[in-house]
């Protein structure tokens, strides 16, 4: 495997490279054959919205001059929409952090199969979170994604519960190669960030 280099993209660069990001998305998330175009278009629509969110940040990895992985996120809206549908009470300190704009949502972590289990995902998350002033990071993951859940546990994340967003809600989820559909049950995980 070639050496992997990680770099940060500005909002403008992310918008300019959206087609390349979508290519990685399609390759990383092996969906139903024949649905690639629809999945790609849905991703591009959501990505265009996410790039405009407050606190958007993104890192990309490449190996041998080719894309290997992408990760991005943003500060969660203060309205608490992220937590709706959670099957447990949101801890008061998490609510306080959300209202004060101190929660970073890891929206996507896409690692191509050839680069999985090599530490790339760990490095991507670490680099992405370096510049945020948030006190907490959270994400949603498909509970059947054993590799993703295992990575979260090894990184010291805590599961808050399962959530089913309203059918109309578009809530990003991380899959490390296994996508989650809109309205699907996801597990909500979080981790405190040290200053």
Task: Give the role of each language-model region.
Residues 1-19, 23, 27:
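Conserved N-terminal entry element of GNAT/NAT acetyltransferase domains
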Residues 2, 66-70, 104, 184:
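Glycine-rich phosphate/pyrophosphate-binding loop shared by adenosine-nucleotide-utilizing enzymes
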Residues 22-38:
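Helix-loop element at the rim of GNAT/NAT acetyltransferase active sites that forms part
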Residues 35-64, 68, 72-75, 95:
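Active-site rim helix/loop that mediates acceptor-substrate recognition in acyltransferases
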Residues 71-108, 167-171:
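Conserved acyl-donor/pantetheine-binding loop and adjacent beta-alpha core of acyl/acetyltransferases
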Residues 104, 130-143:
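Conserved GNAT acetyl-CoA-binding A-motif
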Residues 106-113, 117-130, 150-154:
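Conserved acetyl-CoA-binding loop-helix of GNAT-fold acetyltransferases
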Residues 122-123, 136, 143-171, 179-181:
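Conserved active-site alpha-helix within GNAT-family acetyltransferase domains
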